[in-house]
Amino acid sequence: MSIQQIFAIRMNALAAFLLGVSGVTADATAADAPAAASAATAAPVAGTPVAGAPVASAKKSSEPIVTGPVAGVSGTGDLVLAEGGRTTSVVVVRESAGQWEKRAALDLASYIERIADAKPRVASTPADVAAALANSNSVPTLIVGQAALDADPTLKTALQKASTAAKAAPLLRIDAVAIRRVGQRVYLAGSNDDSHYYAVSELLQRWGCRWYMPGEFGEHIPRHPRLAVGQLDYAYASPFEVRRYWLSWNGDTTGQQEFMRRNFFNEEVVPNGHNLAQFTKELIPPGKSMFNVPISEDRTADHVAGQLEKAFANGERIQLGMEDGIYQSDSAADRQLIALQYDKYFLTQSYTDAFMTFYNKTAQRLLAKHPNSRALIGFLIYSNITLPPVKDITAAKPLVGYFAPIDFDPIHGMDDPRSKPRRECRDIFHRWAKIMQGRLVIYDYDQGMLVWRDLPNPSHQAFRHDVQHYLKAGILGVDTESRGAMATTGLNLFLRGQLLWRPAIDVDGLIAEHYTSFYGPAAEPMAAYWNAIYRVWEETLATEHEYFLAPAIYTPELLATLRARLADANQRLAPLAGRGDAASKRFVERLRFVSLGFAVLENYMAMTRAAATDTDFAAAVAAGERGLAAREQLTAMNPTFTTYKTIGEHGYAWWPGEVKQYQELLPLVNGSKGQLVAKLPLVWNWRRDEKDVGVKENWFRQPIDLAAWNSLPKPIGPAERWALEGKWEQVSADLYLQAQGVLGPDYQSYTGHGWYQTDIELSGAQIAGPLRLKFPGIFNECWLYVNGEMVAHRPFQGVWWMNDYRFEWEVDVAGKFKAGKNSIVIRHHNPHHFGGMFRRPFLYRAVTP
């Protein structure tokens, strides 16, 4: 069943809102409304996949979402906890309870009050607990944590069975919960302090409580005048030992701890970060850096093991991750190992065999002295040690690897036929899982765009598929690096928590439910709004990351769809404006959140179009400043919505830096430093040169033959482009090549040499004076030819992100053009990811100040 179908069913719960908002009462939500007559399905969405693209098969989840005023199977014997604003129920918890065990009891009482207008008493002193348990045959009693385990010791057996079913031999921990109703008693317990809270969260979620984002803004607490527990005997344990996220870039942590427990995250970690240099600094060769130490030599293992021995003997968890960079060793032993394979992603030799030799040697030395130690050594599988080793290596038992595939497609799932990089990542992952014998944690990036622009960046479309691979491989779990920034990440963390706890959960059901509970009367247009975004991310052929791909996702067609849906949503919520009840205020606030997010998105894309497509830098600066102002409003609304305030945004990689770049380009065309002579064409001819024969065959002088291209039916997809077999085709200068469908037959981004060509008519007046050709955005090493003559060469670091983030190239072309028709040819070499132009070039004449 699709999200749209599920949503249509759930819309039946919204009739009171959709037929007349006057029925909204204080603290009521959409969940209270009686059935509606019908609901419209989502409208057609812009941004459909390029013609000829394969479609990924969706793995359907098997566990439906069941919520309501009765937790468990309802019947005549339901245990009523609260009704009509009254309750006699008691929550029992030990006085000596742990932090989250105690918080679980307090939150349970608090949320029951918010759901049913009646707050149970909390008994925690020994005398109060004893009295509550003595009266539990006549009074509804909810017993939390160790108190439940003491009152019903058979719960321990249930927890153990659930734990064994999830993982027979856990390495770090197991998180299990048990919820059982016996007569007037409801037992809620877990296998540890966190799990006691998970048990309470399980119960609350059965009543319909949700925590979509940290803090009060992100929670949905339904209203039930009668709250009960039916027949209920449930025990469960997550198959993943590590279910953690942390906030990088100084993201705002407000509400994080509660959000984590309510969505079943834990804080389990084996330290793995960049710290190797502190143990190898004495081994740095003269005149070299920490990246030049010998790696696989015995002396390195001896040196490091000696420093770790005390911690290892004490059974500690030891951090031993590579430094954040590219290693280059001159050791003869290392050179022999790194010669085994080349890493095409990092454009250097793979150091995995050398590092795994080092890690195993170090671990073996420590184990030889302390064979019974329970110590663990964490390290990163990252940078140029991402590829599995060539040699047949099994990791020594103390080693725990954190697999951090930072430079792989972050958009698609591992089985998606549209992404060769992700399918390669899948195979790499499974190989590492075998090498590590399951002692593997995914170092998960969310959002995966890294340097981004506060635009929606959903990632559940990939994670929901990948988590099934993690389950199959039996790894330890997932450790997510997020920056919070909820306007960007949205439901990503919520869905991660739910999937890591229960991999079979119905993701589509959770998303559909979110619309009704979060947006109330605006649920229908908001479903269409967000489903449009999700669909484009799901179906895009783009596999790259960072803000350059935004125009490939957020097309004018998609923006028009979103604008219309947002207008519809605002119209539906208009009657709620100014109302004082909490529910109305929440719905209005959430729609304002979406509206400000759209203002950020719309203005950023207007800026991009003005600069990249129209060469209108004044308009680009104005749109960029409007977008940044909208972002300020979004941040003022809630500091968890963005992160830029705390990290600072210095340099051209960031949005203010991009606006600054356009401010610096503006004088070149407005007469202060230069006069615009001509915008080069937006559409260029382009040709693959896989065998690098173009120079030898004088492609820079040959006439352009577009016969094959012109014969193709439109629209043209990647398969049709590939079928041209290297003949001339056409591309746009305002978007990098891969996002236009310039791919290999397996949907791998095209790498290698390519040729751009265009003609431009210039008058004698236009070619006079100090003429300069400006490429405001172009990747790769390039060679420029004008009228068959090579006039400039542009060097470029192979890995694109190691270059100046302006990605500009300016060439003095005075005297190179003639009056009349001129040919401009660019030869470029793309070894990695992004290829070609992404901002339209222009000719300008320099003006003397």
What are these regions (language model features)?
Residues 30-36, 52-178, 227-233:
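Acidic, contiguous N-terminal accessory segments
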Residues 96, 104-107, 111, 158-360, ...:
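Feature activates predominantly on carbohydrate-active enzymes
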Residues 292-302, 310, 420-522, 528:
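Structured mid-domain segments that build the active-site/substrate or prosthetic-cofactor binding neighborhood
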Residues 340-359, 395-415, 499-507:
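Acidic, His- and aromatic-enriched active-site or binding-groove loops in soluble protein domains
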Residues 378-407, 454-459, 486-493:
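Substrate-binding cleft/loops of secretory-pathway carbohydrate-active enzymes
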Residues 474, 498-683:
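Catalytic domains of carbohydrate-active enzymes that cleave complex glycans
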Residues 667-776, 794-809, 823-826, 830-849:
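Extended carbohydrate-recognition surfaces in non-catalytic/accessory domains of CAZymes
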Residues 785-791:
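Short strand-turn-strand beta-turns centered on an Asx-Gly dipeptide
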